[in-house]
């Protein structure tokens, strides 16, 4: 039975208290956010695609945690089986530490270890991940020719069928891993000792609570900190009104659903190319709301249909209010949507307006999202995470995809509530 894994080791490096709580008080964890779930799904999808780069492998994924020990034995047997050339999710254990290696490939009389990442670059955390895996592999006496990180090539442009040889790039981290081995051995011994203690280590809250990842025990450790979120928001109204202009202009509220797939879907696209896969337009012509919705979730190749529809539907308004983390004008210009000067000047990203007007509240310090702003302005209300829409949009379940229209409308109505409240309409 193992004591540590790759994830718990990395957790210990970030905060020893988090490691202790995870192993001894897991029920204190925060609920997994929709954003985290979306990231996990993206990583899993890229990992499965990476396996096709090395076809014909054996999947060693355990069916349950109780099967880890069995899979460790099977993995080691496969290393000496000449008929086995590739394994996926191979399971190794050394020094009470268990790892599951994304891909391991026979390389002559040795093996090449590969860790897959869905990012466009390599971070220090990824390097440490690989160094730990190297430590366990060497401890298991696996003859290694190299250990590499396999990640997305930012310069790849799709032209026809997906070219995995061009989509992925490799970087050896063997030299780095070898230099880190003594540190890892000491850390593992230290972490195992911490886990055995009767009480969690006394560690004050600080930057480690959010770096490099937001800690899943954030709510527990911060529960006694005075709740600044109870204080009302502040804003520079003079700047706000200058940016808004005439409050009585005819206004439409636009909620755009962008998709940035790690793997390009269409010819001419690069990894993480952004395009519109759905939108909701909300307006009020007198007494009743007017709502127009569109999406192409059943066929993403139809995404360009959104552009003329948006141009047509927004043409009759003096102003279009949206809320987006990206530069919305630049994004729409890429789709040739804003070639018309008549439409270009109408688009107003209310997120940028609030930031320029120094909108301040405890909730938006680390997350200037629509949800955080809404709950700052209306402290007695809540709004779901936007990542819920992303997850449902990418779901294979038609019922979950059908929820998108309603959620886009709800976000749009929340934006209108914020707008009217803040500018006192």
Stretch-by-stretch model annotation:
Residues 1-109, 229, 393-395:
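Metal-dependent nuclease catalytic cores that hydrolyze phosphodiester bonds in DNA/RNA
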Residues 92, 239-314, 338:
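Conserved RNase H-like, two-metal-ion catalytic cores of nucleic-acid enzymes
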Residues 84-90, 94, 98-102, 113-116, ...:
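Conserved DEDDh/DEDDy metal-dependent 3′-5′ exonuclease domain
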Residues 160-227, 373-425:
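Acidic, Mg2+-coordinating catalytic module of metal-dependent nucleases/exonucleases
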Residues 226-242:
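Helix-hairpin-helix
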Residues 15, 103, 133, 215, ...:
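A residue-level signal for conserved active-site and pocket-lining positions in enzyme catalytic cores
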Residues 21, 223-226, 261-264, 331:
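Short helix/loop capping segments that flank catalytic or ligand/cofactor-binding pockets
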Residues 106-110, 224, 283-286:
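Short acidic-glycine loop/turn motifs at beta-strand connectors
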């Amino acid at each position: 039975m193992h004591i540590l894994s790759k994830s718990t080791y990395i957790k210990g490096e970030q905060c020893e208290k988090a490691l202790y709580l995870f192993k001894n008080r897991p029920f204190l964890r925060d609920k997994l956010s929709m954003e985290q779930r979306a990231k996990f799904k993206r990583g899993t999808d890229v990992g499965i695609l990476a396996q096709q780069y090395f076809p014909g492998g054996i999947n060693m994924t355990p069916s349950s945690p109780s099967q880890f020990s069995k899979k460790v034995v099977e993995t080691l047997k496969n290393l000496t089986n000449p008929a086995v050339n590739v394994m996926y999710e191979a399971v190794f254990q050394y020094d009470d530490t268990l790892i599951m290696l994304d891909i391991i490939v026979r390389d002559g009389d040795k093996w090449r270890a590969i860790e897959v990442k869905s990012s466009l670059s390599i971070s220090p955390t990824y390097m440490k991940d690989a160094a730990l895996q190297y430590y366990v592999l060497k401890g298991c006496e696996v003859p290694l020719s190299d250990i590499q990180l396999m990640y997305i090539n930012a310069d790849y442009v799709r032209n026809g069928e997906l070219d995995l040889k061009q989509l992925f790039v490799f970087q050896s981290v063997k030299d780095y891993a070898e230099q880190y081995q003594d540190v890892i051995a000491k850390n593992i011994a230290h972490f195992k000792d911490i886990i055995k203690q009767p009480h969690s280590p006394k560690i004050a809250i600080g930057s480690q609570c959010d770096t490099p990842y937001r800690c899943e025990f954030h709510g527990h450790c911060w529960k006694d900190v005075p709740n600044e979120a109870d204080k009302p928001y502040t804003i520079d109204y003079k700047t706000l009104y200058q940016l808004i202009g005439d409050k009585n202009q005819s206004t439409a509220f636009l909620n755009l659903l962008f998709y940035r797939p790690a793997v390009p879907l269409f010819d001419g696209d690069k990894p993480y190319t952004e395009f519109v896969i759905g939108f909701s337009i909300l307006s009020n012509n007198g007494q009743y709301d007017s709502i127009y919705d569109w999406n192409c979730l059943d066929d993403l190749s139809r995404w360009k249909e959104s552009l003329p529809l948006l141009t047509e539907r927004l043409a009759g308004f003096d102003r279009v209010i949206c809320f987006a983390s990206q530069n919305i004008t630049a994004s729409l210009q890429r789709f040739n949507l804003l070639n018309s000067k008549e439409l270009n000047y109408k688009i107003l990203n209310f997120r940028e307006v609030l930031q320029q007007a120094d909108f301040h509240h405890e909730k938006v310090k680390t997350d200037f999202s629509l949800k955080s702003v809404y709950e700052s302005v209306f402290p007695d209300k809540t709004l779901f995470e936007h990542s819920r829409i992303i997850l449902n949009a990418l779901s294979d379940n038609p019922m979950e995809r059908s929820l998108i229209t309603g959620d886009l409308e709800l976000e749009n109505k929340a934006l209108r509530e914020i707008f009217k409240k803040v500018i006192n309409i």
